Every structure is written in C-alpha cells, then in structure tokens.
C-alpha cells in the first residue's frame, strides 16, 4: 500500500480551529474555541468526536479531515503523544462500512509512514492497521511476510510480548485466506519463546501445528518438532499426529483417525484433506528409497484404485516435490528426484557424499581437459618444427 506524505498549508492553530468548527457543525459535543491547555488537549477533544463524520459525508471529504488530524499528530513530541495516537487508532477501527474502512486504513497507513522510524508508537499504529485491513479484506496490502514485517521495525524492534501479540493477530487475519502465510507466522511466533517460557505457549503451539497440517502447500513439517513450545506437547495427541505427518506413512494416519476421530475433527482438520496430504507424503517417502515403483505397489501403499494412480502422480508432479516419469505401458513410475520429508543426520551425510562425488568428478574432468590442452600444444609445436 502506498501512502503520500502529510502536508497541510495551515498553521497548527488554524487547523485545530477549523477542525473544531467542522465537528461542531456536524453536531459533535465540542467547543469551536481552541483549548488554552495546548494542542495536545485540542487533539484529545477532536479525536474524541472525529467518528461523527462517519455518519455523513463523502469518503474523499472524510479522508481530507483525517489527513488534517494526522498532520497535527505527527508534530506532538513522543513523550506526550502515546495516548493521542492510541485514541486515534481505536477510532479508526470503528468505521461503519467498507468505503469508510478503506479511508481509515489509508489514514492509519499515512500515520504509520509519517512517524519517525525509531518511534515505538509505530507498533501500536501497525497493530490497529492490521485490524482495519482485515475488516476491509486488504491484509496483504499491509502484510506480505515476516521479513517485510521485521524490516519495518528494524529501527525500533517491539518487545517479545508485543511481537507475540502481533503474530497472533496476523495468524488470525490470514488463516482463512492464506494458510501458508498463516503457518509461517505461527512458526515465527513459537520462535519468540525461550526454554524458560515455552511451557506457557501450549495454545500457540497447538495452533501452529494445526495450521501447518491444514495448509495444502506445507509438506516439510520436521522443523516444527525442534520448536521448544512444540516439545512441551510431547505425549499429547496433537504431537502424535504431527509426528505421523513428519515421518509415518498413510496407514499410521488411518489408524490414528480411527482411534481419535473426534479429536481430529475438533481441531478443525478435514479428514479427506489429511488423507490427500498423507498420500503425497507417503509417495515422497517411497520415492526416497525406490527409484522405480509399480502401480500395484502404489495402490496398496496409498490405498487407491489402479485407475487413480496416474492422476495422483500427475498431481504430485505439479507440486515439484518429486520429479518422475510415468511408464503407462509397464504400469510403473520412474523417480528422478524427491524432496526429503525429514532432513537429519542421514540426509546431511548423503548430501556430503553427493558433493564429494561431484568434486571428484570435476577434478577428473579438469585433469582430462588439462591433458587434452597439453596434447594440442605439443601437436602445434611439432607441426611448426615440421614446417
């Protein structure tokens, strides 16, 4: 979302006077006279009634009024501005309809970008900004990822508690429209806990697991097991279910669902989607150890009919998690490569061996090229001697 700088030609006193008159004319309980206590008191009074303009008026006109209020707010010293900014942010969350919600969103974005980047008030503005963006269905206009979020607060990082609160909000506003982004937010949230306070993050850890399992685009689930809050769930059903998605095959999930059907459903997880994901994860695991698989093997392992094998493999190839070739004539699947479901010591050793083999092959090629080059030089020299 773009935001233009705030520039108002009138002096502060003139702006305050005009705003007071404007809101009084709309019927607000406010004096048209400037306060003798200073501009901060004027702002408190103006912000207290500013939502009266939501009842009437065009969005463009209201945007101009809010812009004027913002232009005054950004002049208030930091030590006296917190209550004013918080009061304004709260008012902006009360827009009665979508067009005005977008006006309030733009106003908060303008305030956020015109505050000093080292101001701790930017956190509070951004938190309310996300709330309003959700109301307007424009969350991705203000939040595109964790890296972008961190860069915005680089000059004044919020406290761990503040970031936890913000991550929870971001998870809530993205979980219905972007599960992948929501899952990344929850993983980041769990990363803010330490060994000392991980035990109190039980609810966050459960939400993180459920979000990751429900996300159709998240397949590498092994890193979740290393998060401290997730470790505290060992022995719980949700941790058992995560472990199945990390390293077990489809039959293990089917058995778990038969034993704990109510639990799975109570977490908001869809059984058919779980089956689809577990089939893909099972296929990946089979591909790790079997460069060639028959359709018969896949029907047994994936619990599908033989005529469903080809469509299933095609769907797997679309994810780019596995590279393979279908051999319809011989009812086989030839695996070229696959992403590992887990990446532990064995996978690191395999990668080391592969890189070592590449290094040796490159050395052999280099030696061969050197020999060919030397031979060509010798041949050229001998031809010169003959002539």
UniProtKB/Swiss-Prot annotation:
Residues 181-340 form the PCI domain. It comes from Drosophila yakuba. The keyword Cytoplasm applies. One of its GO terms (biological process) is Golgi organization. The gene is Tango7. Component of the eukaryotic translation initiation factor 3 (eIF-3) complex, which is involved in protein synthesis of a specialized repertoire of mRNAs and, together with other initiation factors, stimulates binding of mRNA and methionyl-tRNAi to the 40S ribosome. The eIF-3 complex specifically targets and initiates translation of a subset of mRNAs involved in cell proliferation. This is Eukaryotic translation initiation factor 3 subunit M. HAMAP family: eIF3m. One of its GO terms (cellular component) is investment cone. Component of the eukaryotic translation initiation factor 3 (eIF-3) complex. The eIF-3 complex interacts with pix. Belongs to the eIF-3 subunit M family. Its main location: cytoplasm. Keywords: Cytoplasm, Golgi apparatus, Initiation factor, Protein biosynthesis. Pfam families: eIF3m_C_helix, PCI. InterPro entries: COPS7/eIF3m, eIF3m, eIF3m_C_helix, PCI_dom, WH_DNA-bd_sf. PROSITE patterns: PCI. It is found in: Cytoplasm; Golgi apparatus. GO terms for molecular function: caspase binding; cysteine-type endopeptidase activator activity; translation initiation factor activity.
């Amino acid at each position: 979302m773009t935001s233009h700088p705030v520039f108002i030609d009138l002096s502060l006193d003139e702006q305050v006077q005009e705003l007071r008159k404007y809101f009084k004319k709309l019927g607000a309980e406010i004096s048209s006279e400037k306060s003798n206590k200073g501009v901060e008191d004027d702002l408190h009074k103006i912000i207290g009634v500013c939502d009266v303009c939501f009842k009437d008026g065009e969005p463009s006109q209201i945007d101009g009024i809010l812009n004027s209020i913002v232009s005054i707010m950004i002049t208030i010293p930091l030590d006296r501005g917190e209550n004013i900014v918080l009061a304004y942010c709260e008012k902006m969350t009360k827009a009665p309809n979508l067009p005005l919600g977008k006006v309030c969103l733009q106003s908060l974005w303008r305030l956020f970008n015109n505050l000093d980047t080292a101001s701790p008030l930017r956190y509070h503005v951004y938190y309310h900004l996300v709330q309003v963006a959700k109301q307007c269905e424009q969350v991705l206009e203000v939040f595109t990822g964790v890296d972008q979020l961190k860069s915005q607060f680089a000059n004044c990082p919020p406290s761990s508690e503040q970031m936890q609160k913000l991550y929870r909000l971001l998870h809530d506003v993205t979980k219905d429209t972007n599960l992948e982004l929501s899952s990344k937010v929850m993983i980041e949230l769990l990363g803010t806990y330490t060994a000392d306070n991980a035990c109190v993050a039980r609810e966050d850890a459960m939400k993180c697991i459920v979000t990751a399992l429900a996300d159709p685009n998240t397949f590498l689930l092994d890193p979740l097991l290393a998060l401290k809050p997730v470790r505290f769930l060992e022995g719980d059903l949700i941790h058992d279910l995560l472990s199945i998605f990390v390293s077990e095959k489809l039959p293990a999930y089917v058995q778990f669902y038969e034993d704990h059907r109510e639990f799975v459903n109570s977490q908001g997880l869809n059984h058919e989607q779980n089956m689809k994901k577990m089939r893909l994860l099972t296929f990946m695991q089979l591909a790790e150890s079997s460069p060639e698989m028959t359709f018969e093997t896949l029907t047994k392992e994936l619990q599908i009919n033989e005529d469903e094998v080809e469509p299933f493999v095609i769907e797997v190839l679309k994810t780019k998690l596995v590279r393979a070739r279908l051999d319809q004539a011989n009812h086989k699947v030839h695996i070229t490569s696959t992403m590992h479901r887990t990446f532990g010591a064995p996978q690191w050793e395999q990668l080391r061996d592969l890189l070592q083999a590449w290094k040796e092959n490159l050395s052999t090629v280099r030696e061969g090229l050197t020999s060919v080059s030397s031979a060509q030089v010798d041949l050229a020299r001998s031809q010169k001697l003959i002539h």
